[in-house]
Every structure is written in structure tokens, then in C-alpha cells.
Amino acid sequence: MWILLFHGHFSNDTENENKSNPNINFKLMYMKQSMKSKGFERRLLLIMWGLFLSLSAFAQQISIKGHVVDATGEPVIGASVVEGRTTNGTITDVDGNFSLSVPANSTLTISFVGYKTQTVPVNGKNSLKVTLQEDTEVLDEVVVVGYGTMKKSDLTGAVSSVGVKDIKDSPVANIGQAMQGKVSGVQIIDAGKPGDNVTIKIRGLGTINNSNPLIVIDGIPTDLGLSSLNMADVERVDVLKDASATAIYGSRGANGVVMITSKRGAEGAGKVTVNANWAIQNATKVPDMLNAAQYAALSNDMLSNNDDNTNPYWADPSLLGTGTNWLDEMLRTGVKQSYSVSYSGGTEKAHYYVSGGFLDQSGIVESVNYRRFNFQANSDAQVNKWLKFTTNLTFSTDVKEGGSYSIGDAMKALPIQPVKNEDGSWSGPGQEAQWYGSVRNPIGTLYMMTNETKGYNFLANITGEIAFTKWLKLKSTFGYDAKFWFVDNFTPAYDWKPNPVEESSRYKSDNKSFTYLWDNYFVFDHTFAQKHRVGVMAGSSAQWNNYDYLNAQKNIFMFDNIHEMDNGEKMYSIGGSQSDWALLSLMARLNYSYEDKYLLTATVRRDGSSRFGKNNRWGTFPSVSLAWRISQEEWFPKDNSPVNDLKLRIGYGVTGNQEIGNYGFVASYNTGVYPFGNNNSTALVSTTLSNPNIHWEEVRQTNFGVDMSLFNSRVNLSLDAYIKKTADMLVKASIPITSGFEDTTETFTNAGKMRNKGVEMTLRTINLKGLFSWESALTATYNKNEILDLNSETPMFINQMGNSYVTMLRAGYPINVFYGYVTDGPVSYTHLRAHET
């Protein structure tokens, strides 16, 4: 006969093989009727009886009634009550009561927006009373600020955060793209090309020079591109926006600070996490192009109207058919795939996190590809009661590939021209330019010219923490940031009319950047008389960077597939450069809280930078901000109030911008060749005069803000208004020719002024919570930019297209404003003939 045995854990004196296996299995066994052993029968009967009892208990359904209240005893209306991991559930009525039929040994999960979810075992009971506790996760959230962390409820400045749950499922390639639209006051511009970095602007463009924010990864300021990071390794991103938050970074805080924190291990058994992501990309709003017949007909009309000869091959344009759509030939569906595996865990005294990742992305333009490999290793070790070590290591290597291409050329290329000739060679216009234009075959250049950039990035730090007492610690951090990238371009020779490339060429460049950082600071955190909470951070920071660059180009290679530099017959160019900069700083921050109602944050930083002359090498950058948590006042209504947290903030601070290059204060020269007698001699030509008096661009910012949490943190609103003024903006001033220098000679001077003012709003709501959850977020930003002074009434024209400039810098206008003639309307040929003179 066949018997189904419920097999749990059995053991006796001679059989212990399953002792360590608590898993429950079902086994199908065949028992011969000849087995008449009394011991066996007794055991079999016991097993069957146990199975019967277990199945009976499992199948027993009971009707359970319950009452759900909050901490004050008020009923919670509409709370979700669900049996375990099933879809069997209900909601509480207007009195907080519910009734549900469940197995006697099941568990119930009770949840409601604004309260912590509770799991309650039934244990055969017929009635339950459940008290839900308010969920203060939003207020207790810890945000990363410069050289430390703070609870969100203690913040006095403008700080926005993006957590791992906001970015983990984003179908994008890097963390910068994942932040788009999630932080108010932050504009993120995606370059669109795989592997290229996004451009981040915080609260508008604050200068005509470099307005990019400072990037800090695991406490280390770096210029590492966000495209080099593995999104799966990022725990959170905190954006410091106003001066009271960024002044701790002094001369580098004017444009805001982006703090990126990577994931860490936690106490518990080792956990393996696998992430896989696949997405496709397509160009949007692709313009409709003329086909061959339409283009030929339109060209014939144009030539006839201009009294020019038309192309005899276009006598009947309809015979040309559709021809070539060069945009369709150039564009494709891009595919992105990324994979990562991490292993994390730890004990009470040591935690670890290790991960590896791979990203492969093909761009929407043919032959454009990007690949990246990542490795992350973080650890924490509590050596003893007073000593702790923390390490972070981020490594990535990537390859960007792609030929030379131009979307504009693809739009201008002729649809009457095929991509390739009948013999398989690349086609190209070969007749008169008036008929065929002057654009090379844009698909041929895409495949024949090769561009490759390989990068290697290594970012690491180790922090030692000495605890003198529970409230006084010393932290020392050493950071190392190394970047290597190698560019390799090859262009073969080809005879494409009307612009042939007569010489093949290969260009290579090697770039190396090394940055060393050493931070030392004390951290004090203590509460006095249970009312006065004081936090102090004070210390120093030293940072040094070295950059080395070497490039060379050789022309005329005999074979296109053998183009090592040694094989080039002609040395076209060779060059290189080296630069250094250093920054030495002293900084301090004071946080004070009285009964969690009145909050104060004051910071000061003094920076000394090698980028400025000895007359103005040092600068001081202070800030102060205040906050009032009105909801903590005794008179503020607590019971049945829709507002559970309300805070007002005000802050003012001074920050700087030193991103002007390394040697702006010294004189610079270019080489030139001049005839002296019968010979040409090399000479130095002055291009920039020295100015040892230039100093940091200075940004003064005032911020007003309000934070509000409603309906048990179901709705969270933040509003900020700001005025940001940039003074002593570094601009280039022309030198009068009466000085003896050429009229192209310039010098840096602190003269420009700019202003940004605006408002920001962030609204986050928790709409549903339980078996199905739904959260939403809305961000809105308004910013107005205006140049107040440029040290000249003459506008500075920038951003050239063809032979014309399209934007300018001018006092009274926004930065990079487009300009042109204002017309009254189109002018017709008839109108011109009527006004002939």
C-alpha cells in the first residue's frame, strides 16, 4: 500500500543524520504488508495520529474579531488587516473594529498610513485588541551633512534627500539620471550619450564660470563623475542647497553640495542580493525629413527661382523614390542592461559589504557603446570600546566607444545619395556643390573613424575613530582618489568629395589625476539638564591634487589596420601639461537644541587655496541658521490635530567658489613664430597678465523655509524661498593697447555680480499602505537669474553657431540669454518690390 508520511525531525540513538535539519518534508514511501514488526506498527500509528492532528489544526478556521486603536485610545478607521502573506483581509470600520475568518494558527498584519505596521499571532484567540504606534520615520530620518549626520527633525538648513527606494528601480544608467525630478531646486541635464556625465545645477547658475556643485562620496570631496558609480551600491543622496548647509565646505560650497553615501553591512547572517535591470531607449520627436523625390523637386524650384541651372538627373523627381533617410540610418534602439551582486552582513562588532557590478549600454546612435565594471567594498570594525575603523573602497573601469558623428550632418545629408555605392564603398557627393551640398557621408564617418576612451577610477578612504567618552570622539580620515583615462582616436584617409581627408591620423592622450585628503576633527555631543542638547564639530582638512597630461598625434599610416604610433610617418603634434593645487582648511560647527523646540546651527570655515595669489590666499566663510518647531510647544494642539509636525527655518551664510583653474593669478604666455632678419624665431606672447589680488567669488544667501507633516506623516510638505547673490565674480578684463600689450591680452579681476532668487516645493504623500502600497512625490521650482554687473557695458558674446554668436552675457539680463533682431513679421517678395528705391 501507499502511505503519505508527514516527516519532521526524527532521531534515535542510532539515527541522527537529520538532527541539524529542521526543514519539513513530504515523503512517499511504499510499505510492504509483510512488515509486521510491532515496533514499526506502533511508530506508524503514532505518525499517522500526529499527521491527523496537525492537518486538523491546520484546517480549523476561526472567526476572529478585533479592535484597532492608536496610542491615545482613539479608533483607527480604515486600517488594513491581512492574514499573513495571503490576500485574505479586511479593513476596520468607523469604530476601529474588524471581523475575519482565519486559521487558528495564522498571523495578522495590521497597517495604516502614518503608523508602524504590526504583525500579531492569532494563537487560536477569538478577539484581539491592537494598538498602533505613530510612525515617525520621516522625522527620525538621518541625513548626511558635511563631516557628520543629523536627524531630519533637527535640520535648520535646506537639505533634500533621495533614498534607495526612490532610485533602486529606475531604468537608467547612473545615479545622476535617477535623481532627475526628485529634488526641488536641482536641475539635472543628461548629455544623452552613454557614459557621459550629467550636468547638475543647484538653485540656478550662480556664476559665469564653473557652477557645478561639489560632489562628496562617503565623506571624500571628489570630481569623480557620477556615471562611474554603480547605482545598486548607493544608499542615499543628500543635496545641501542653502549657505547654512554648504558653508561647512567654505570656498567650494557656493554651487551646492551633493552628498552620496554607499551601502554598508549590518549585524546578521550574510545576505546575498542580486539586481538585474534591462531597458531600451529611443530618440523622441525625431523630425520628419524630405525623401529623395521631395528634395529634388524642392531643389529644382529653388534653383529655378534663382535663375540657376537645374540638375538634369532630377528632371522627373518622382523617379528618385524615397532615397535615404540618413537619420534613420544613424539612429537605432539603444539597449541598457546592468547586473550586480552584493554580499553583506556582520557581527555585533564588525560589518561588511562587498559588491560587483556590470553595465552594458548601446547608444541610440550606431556604433556608440559603453561598458562599465564596478567593485565596492565597505567595512566597519569596533576594535574595542574606544577604537573603531571604517573603510570604503570604490573601483570602476569603463570603456566608451564610438565613431565621429553629427546629428546635424545627418539632417543636412542628401536623401538622393545612397549610403554605399554598388561596389560596397561608402558613397559621397562628387558633383557640383550647388546640387549636392558639402556634407560628407555621415554614416561612413561614423564607422570609419574610431574613438575610444578607457577610464580607471579608484576612490578609497579609511577613518579611525577614538572615543574618549560617550560624548567626545576624535575622527581622522585619510582619502585617496586616483583617476586614469586614455583617449585613442584614429581617422583613415579617404577621398570623399567635396572634403577629402588626405592623411590618416592617430591621436592619443594619457591623463592622470591624484588627490590626497587628510581630515582630523573632534565631535562633541551631549545633553545638559535633559533640555540643552549641544553638538560641536571642529577640526582641520588638507587636500592636494596633481594632474598630468600627455598627448601626441602622428599622420600618414600605410595600413589602416596597423596604426601603432611607431608606424606613422609624420609627427603632427606632441604636447602635455602638469598642474597642482592644494587646499588647507580649519572648520567648526555648533548645533544647539532646547527641548527639541528651538534649534541653532552655526558654522565657520577658513580656507587657504593655492589657486589665488599671496595677497588673498585665505578666506573665511560663516553661516548661521535657526529653526522653531512650533508643534513641540505645549500650547500647540496635539489631539485630533491634522498637523503632527510644523517647523519654521531661517538661515544666512557666505560661501565661495574657487573653481577658476589653478593659475589664474599668474601671467600666462603662448609661443609664436616671428621673423627677425632673414630667420624665423620662436617668441613668447603674453595672453594673460598677472593679478595677485584676485580672490574667491563670494556668494551670500538667505533662506526661509517651512516643513510640515500632516495626518500622521501621511502628507509631508517642504517650502523654501531664497535669495542668492554672487559678488566679486571672476571675469576677464581687456588690457588697453596703450599699455604696450596686444589688444587680445586679458587679466582676471573680481568685478561681476549676479543674483538668483526663487521658491521651491516638495510634497510627498503616502496614499496606501498595506498589501498594496502607493506613494507619490511632487517637486516644483521657480528660479529667476539676473546678471547685475560685468565690469563693462559691452556684452560678452558666447556660444557660437557657424559664424554667429547666439547667446550673450549682459548686465540686466539672465545668463546665456539668446539674442537677435526683433521682427514685425515676414517680409514678402511683393513687399520688397513695392518699396524699391
Where are these predicted regions, by residue range?
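Extracellular/periplasmic, surface-exposed regions of secreted and cell-surface proteins
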Residues: 167, 172, 205, 212, ...
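Short, small/polar-rich motifs associated with maturation and membrane association
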Residues: 2-49, 53-376, 381-396, 459, ...
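Acidic, proline/serine/threonine- and glycine-rich low-complexity intrinsically disordered segments
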Residues: 826-828
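Low-complexity intrinsically disordered tracts that form flexible linkers/tails across taxa
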Residues: 400-416, 772, 790-796
